[in-house]
Amino acid sequence: MSGRVLITGATSGIGRQLALDYRRSGWQVWGCGRDGERLQALADEGIIPLQFDGRDSAAMAVIAADLPALDLLILNAGNCEYMDLAEGFDGALFARVIETNLIATGHALAAFLPRLASGSQLAIVGSSVSWLPLPRAEAYGASKAALDYLAATLRLDLATRGIGVTLIRPGFVQTPLTAKNDFPMPCLVTVEEASRAIMRGLAAGRHQIHFPRRFIWLLRLLGALPTGLWLRLGRTLISKGSPS
């Protein structure tokens, strides 16, 4: 199978690997990002580069107007910053993460959703963190939980137009973003493994894609614990300096 796919956040991590793998599979790929040098590296691989800031809705609208119909739209761009409540609630950090992970996704939907016709797919990359409240993840977790709800409502509303919606919820993936983490990351997978799991799930038309399985089951198990017990475990994680 081949077609046309646009991927945001394509200059690094999961997005970059997806762009490369879809291109190698014969797809026409548009890769989006802010970094000109990284976009040029994608262009050298046969990927069509689109440079814009995800917070710039006007720039996205101009770019989208020149695009053909898409078979697949993958909204992957995002960032993670952890909060240290010992210093107080950082409203500026919270706003930055919400703007990058949630508001920019809304801008991308406004710009690129009209390029999807009946039979096409929309994929939104959330996070497995939305299954379980983790320490210091007030901003990141809130932004990803909001994407869960967004994907669920879009799935209902776009079904009448014949557009499938998939929510992707990865566990820890070895990327430049997670390389900054200062805590253990169980069941860490490579970007190649993540890309394969995502491409398989999208090809199968799944509503949700989550991986790796062992980590997801662990999160679900912990999420089923009584709140009081999880609070005690959370305090232990905080005392050990994890992002809990």
Model-identified regions with their sequence ranges:
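Substrate-binding pocket helix/loop in short-chain dehydrogenase/reductase
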Residues: 84-86, 90-96
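Active-site helix of classical SDR
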Residues: 109, 143
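Residue(s) in the substrate-gating loop at a strand-loop-helix junction
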Residues: 127
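C-terminal helical subdomain
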Residues: 167, 183-218
